[in-house]
Amino acid sequence: MIQVIPSIAIRKGKVVKMRKGDPGSEKAYGENPIDLAKRFEDHGIKVVHLVDLDGAEAGAPKNYHVLEGIAGYTDLKVDFTGGVCTDGDISKAFECGADYITAASVAVTDPEQFASWIVSYGREKITLSADVSDPVSKTIAFRGWQRKSDKTLYDHLQFFNDRGLKYAKSTDVTRDGVLEGPNFEFYQDILDRFPDLKILASGGVRGVDDILRFQEMGIFAVIFGKAYYEGILNLKDLEQFAEKSAT
């Protein structure tokens, strides 16, 4: 069964969302991130995707305290991402309660470093974030999606697939936060090219039907955010999804 994972994006301690990765479009939601995580847990969620936006842009995590709070006050497994670029960063993230690490920028700027983490921490603990700001050229976006690499998605995935990668998250940034639906063809291409990778889809999810379609495609997990915060995908929807998936 597909995993359904809510995203909690943090800037300066607040829960926020953007449109297409544009900081100028940022909207803050009046949610305490720890209370929010607890609410997800109370409705059957097992894993949350915690995004340190300050860290992603700075190149070093800035919201370890939020990670510690969620890990300390819930039994959720936390997938932490945002600025994890050094051995010290990843070690501290795990010490603060992260169960998994998702990294993007270091895989672009120091691919051998990221590859070493797959070996050191185990492939179950490490996820590559391979996001694109242009679904045609498929060049990798990093540093909080504010910079573009000359690396292409498929070459990037192949490099780490050859080095033992098991999990890859990918976002078509043009669909993120706009509630226009996921780019299903984008993910189907990834699945076709990399059948051994477990793919986490993120960006554009509107509701249960999108999640079910991803499940039918063979996507490992779907990460959602904006649809929940805007009241389009609510906790009742998630319960409905669980019921549908069980039938």
Question: How should each PLM-predicted stretch be described?
Answer:
Residues 3-4, 55-71, 85-91, 105-127, ...:
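Active-site-adjacent beta->alpha loops and helix N-cap segments on the catalytic face
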Residues 29-41, 86-91, 148-159, 211:
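Short, acidic/polar
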Residues 12-13, 20-24, 94, 98-176:
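Conserved anion-binding
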Residues 74, 78-101, 185-224:
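Catalytic cores of alpha/beta
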Residues 3-7, 47, 75-79, 99-102, ...:
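Structural preference for beta-strand elements that scaffold enzyme active sites
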Residues 19, 138-148, 178-181, 189, ...:
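Active-site-adjacent loop and "lid" segments of alpha/beta metabolic enzymes
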Residues 41-44, 94-95, 161, 215:
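Non-catalytic positions within long, well-ordered alpha-helices that form the structural scaffold/packing
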